[in-house]
Swiss-Prot record:
This is Arginine--tRNA ligase. It comes from the Bacteria. One of its GO terms (biological process) is arginyl-tRNA aminoacylation. Monomer. It is an enzyme of class 6 (ligase). GO terms for cellular component: cytoplasm. It comes from Burkholderia pseudomallei (strain K96243).
Length: 594
């Protein structure tokens, strides 16, 4: 049911309920609160198209039999002239459920709506004028992006698209942790490589990173190469193995550039990159700490500065400043979120790994302790669990490039058909490989709820059959394109014939089911945005592809008779459009040929 139709039916039912309540109570209780009208899709198709339990909600306050109330509500509903175009039949089920069957014309209306709105179908202005800052990926610039970052990128970019579809002005932000201990480890790792050392050699630093990418950084530093991140100034290798600060600066910029390349291959763009180091150079960390001290939210104990996080629900107070004068890692996070608030983002969503769960209470406690108007529960979080990569039935734990983990680039190349063991080779980064790999990785990583662990099966991603979910959905789109092209070629037809087509021939069970599934798309987007659950779009696309295949296998589209032929092509055209729209939400291509 389309949103406008749903709103109309809710209004008609609300009017019906008012009539029944008025007849029962008269004007005796003007303060009586009517229950909200909730419409649901019955789990069993035989029970109708729409179910409503309002009679059950009214039974106790009215002291009436719910089945009798349901009968009265249905009588009042069908007596309204506007209901004739929507409601074909009504029945009372069980203790008092109202089950409604919609008219064929009301179901067929979705085709005209989709064809008229095109890529805008499903979008809403519900949240127009609202701003949201969405922070995701936010990897340390100490190595290539790993598969966990890939899951964040897929979730974050899809959620950004979904929120934008509901009218939000979305600001995508990447926070670079470029000021911690790990950056120092990166510098000494690169320095060791520049000195000719390798992992396992005498003198190799214990905290150093072992991946081959460190050797690449050291080589380019010694060769005097120039590197630049997308938002930064170019940095040239100084060739001095003793200048640790020059090495650090070059290595960080080198890896930021590499991460930019990975994100580009993944199809993810950011509006802003925010550097943790800027929080220190601009004095924001000290300012935040001073404000918390002034607010009485801290105390000194055993030479350390503690934050009273228990005042805000944490299980124990937390150290802010250690005895050596350095800050614990959540302190700059508090300062960073203050900047989000000061920039006018009253809604902020962070997508992070589930290992960050412990920092949520600390960051929120710090923000509350500042007493600057930040609401409780700020920011929102979407936490995702780990990704396990499987190939040939075995877990893949490391890659040649990273040394200790599988990278996003590995996953894109493997899923695109690159030869195992040759990851990172420039010749493999052709557009076809990137597109195939990106589509598979993005769809797979968003095809489960964020809070569930995910097994990424490379072998499944390479399959070209119905077992592969992204292939299944994309093939539905490509098959429709093929049928429509054949229709145009064989009959000299054009798209102009479709908007005004007679849709009455679309009366089969399969056609009705497909049209109802198309009409669900706007609600799917609204739900995905409201619940911060972009996986709902992936679920929906698989269901839509399934309904299409059921229809296509049951009914021949290009029949001799023009009326049913044009109607069926119109249904396919609408289905193709919604498949394209949904895939675009996930950042996945909609191929016309496969």
């Amino acid at each position: 049911m389309l949103p406008a139709q749903k709103h109309t039916l809710e209004t008609l039912l609300e009017n019906s309920v008012k009539q029944v309540v008025q007849a029962s109570k008269g004007d005796a209780d003007a303060a009586f609160v009517l229950p909200a009208i909730a419409l649901e899709r019955p789990k069993v198709a035989a029970h109708g198209d729409v179910a409503c339990n309002v009679a059950l909600q009214l039974a106790k306050p009215l002291g009436a039999n719910p089945r009798q109330l349901a009968e009265q509500i249905v009588a009042a509903l069908t007596a309204q002239p506007e209901a004739a175009g929507l409601v074909d039949a009504a029945e009372i089920a069980g203790p008092g459920f109202i089950n409604l069957r919609l008219t064929p014309a009301s179901k067929q209306a979705v085709i005209g709506a989709v064809l008229a709105q095109g890529r805008a179908f499903g979008a809403s202005e519900r949240d127009h004028g609202k701003r949201v800052l969405l922070e995701f990926v936010s990897a340390n610039p100490t190595g290539p992006l790993h598969v966990g970052h890939g899951r964040q990128a897929a979730l974050g970019d899809a959620l950004a698209n979904v929120l934008a579809s509901q009218g939000y002005a979305v600001h995508r932000e990447f926070y670079y942790n470029d000021a911690g201990v790990q950056i120092g480890n990166l510098a000494i790792s690169t320095q060791a490589r520049a000195r000719g050392l390798k992992p396992g050699d005498a003198g190799w630093p214990e905290a150093a990173y072992n991946g081959e990418y460190i050797a690449d950084i050291a080589r380019d530093y010694l060769n005097g190469e120039t590197v630049a991140a997308s938002d930064g100034e170019p940095v040239t290798g100084k060739r001095d193995v003793e200048d640790l600060e020059a090495i650090r600066k070059f290595a960080v910029t080198y890896l930021r550039r590499e991460q930019d390349m990975d994100l580009k291959a993944f199809g993810v763009k950011f509006d802003q990159y925010y550097l943790e180091s800027s929080l220190y150079t601009e004095g924001r960390v000290e300012k935040t700490v001073d404000a918390l001290i002034a607010a009485g939210m801290t105390y000194e104990q055993e030479g350390a500065l503690w934050l009273r996080t228990t005042d805000e629900g944490d299980d124990k107070d937390r150290v802010m400043r250690k005895t050596d004068g350095t800050y614990t890692y959540f302190v700059p996070d508090v300062a960073y979120h203050v900047t989000k608030w000061e920039r006018g983002f009253t809604k902020v969503i962070n997508i992070q790994g589930s290992d960050h769960h412990g920092t949520i209470a600390r960051v929120r406690a710090g923000l509350q302790g500042l007493h600057i108007g930040i609401p409780k529960g700020y920011p929102d979080y979407v936490l995702h669990k780990m990704v396990t990569v499987m190939r040939d039935g075995q877990e893949v734990k490391i890659s040649k490039r990273a040394g200790s983990y599988v990278t996003v680039r590995d996953l894109i190349e493997w899923s695109g058909g690159a030869t195992p063991g040759s990851e990172g080779s420039p010749e493999l980064l052709d557009e076809a490989t990137i597109t195939r790999g990106r589509d598979a990785v993005r769809f797979f990583l968003i095809s489960r709820k964020a809070d569930t662990e995910f097994v990424f099966d490379i072998d499944l991603a390479l399959k070209q059959n119905d077992e592969n979910p992204v292939y299944y959905v994309q093939y539905a789109h490509a098959r429709i394109c093929s049928v429509i092209n054949e229709w145009k070629s064989r009959y000299g037809a054009t798209d102009a014939l479709l908007p005004g087509a007679d849709l009455s021939p679309l009366d089969s069970k399969q056609a009705m089911a497909l049209m109802q599934k198309l009409a669900e798309y706007p609600d799917v987007l609204a739900h995905a945005a409201g619940e911060l659950a972009p996986h709902a779009v992936a679920f929906y696309l698989r269901e839509l592809a399934s309904e299409f295949h059921s229809f296509y296998n049951a009914e021949r589209v290009l029949v001799d008779e023009q009326a049913p032929r044009t109607a069926r092509v119109a249904l396919l055209a609408a289905t193709r459009q919604v498949l394209e729209n949904g895939l675009a939400m996930l950042g996945v291509s909609a191929p016309s040929k496969m």
